[in-house]
């Protein structure tokens, strides 16, 4: 009977081991609290640390890495002429696998200038190809380097060859940069996406569960990469990568390529050993170039509609400010938590004010909602003021500034590894948090429009959002 399959008691030991191995600390605590006997620490195999599955790799790939020589930046080559580049291209074709990386003038792949490309075909076998070094001074002497268009023409057969696997770390960025130079990189592997498919949500050996180059290098290779700030500086003293001396630029860029090569050698076998091949090969790897194309294509927005909404919001904000000042009995800076707290609890005398360590009253949303529920009209007005101010600054104004002057579209960046659920997340600008349940939020969403003859389709299946729209 069906009742025979009913789970009457949760088997504690295997569940506790599973929860601890995967970092579900809150659930593990609840499991301990629900037991009749005193809580005890789950004892795993002492020879196998917690989360060892993310570090001790089956299939011998860890051993393969151990057999490699340590990273030696002095072995890297700076490729400054066509003959040397031809040699590296020949080496990549012979290896049938090459790790690659691009260096650019900015983080925005849609507008950044290509400064250089690095390649790696094995341990200690890495190079940097400078393309646009020397700064923008027309009269300054430029370092010897291959002309950009000529270098792309030489590299294009390699980057587009089906006979050579190209490996990137966050390859989507590099695909977008090179696509703007007429090059479609394929086939590709992406070590960042591999790491996400294998270790999403895990905090490993105290290093953290991120999937960036520096974290992966330290976690899996025990290697500390050169930091970008150590190459380009920070603040007012920061320089563009194109002004970094070639010897230093070569160390930084070629290291990225070699680290990517080593990470691929480690992570690729884990996919098959740990059952991750199906998801990676059938879903996430094919999705990388698709999402890259989505970013390049961008989203059309109605600038006039946004400007109109922004003006309406500004008018409403000004009206609310006047009403709030009238209720307070004096003008003050509404956006200042300190001044707002003093008005609410000292001047107007509302009860329940609590001061934090800084000595000022808390005026977060929960406090204002409580006061609103108790009949404080000024709290209601401040909540409305905050909402409109945020919508105006975050969306109606910011989206207008985000419109690319060349394409006339907004080119957001979609992260494949930004959400543990597997959903895409959006940044620069963030498009996923635009309100949908309010009329104001819907007005902002209506500013996103389709090209003439097209429609925007929203797809949903059984209340589960699809990975790509």
Regions found by a protein language model. Give the residues of each.
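Conserved "right-hand" nucleotidyltransferase catalytic core of DNA-directed polymerases
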Residues: 1-141, 186, 204-208, 216, ...
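Helix N-cap/beta->alpha junction signal
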Residues: 81, 170-171, 191, 465
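Short, basic/hydrophobic alpha-helical segments
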Residues: 88, 145-163
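Acidic beta-strand-to-loop metal/phosphate-binding motif
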Residues: 99, 163-171, 456-458
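Phosphate- and divalent-cation-binding pockets in alpha/beta enzyme and binding domains
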Residues: 173-180, 343, 468
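Alpha-helical scaffold elements adjacent to nucleotide-binding pockets in ATP/GTP-utilizing enzyme cores
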Residues: 174-177, 212-216
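Residue-level signal for well-ordered alpha-helical positions
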Residues: 180-181, 200, 216, 274, ...
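Conserved beta-strand -> loop -> alpha-helix junction used to position metal-binding or nucleic-acid-contacting
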Residues: 184-200, 212-215
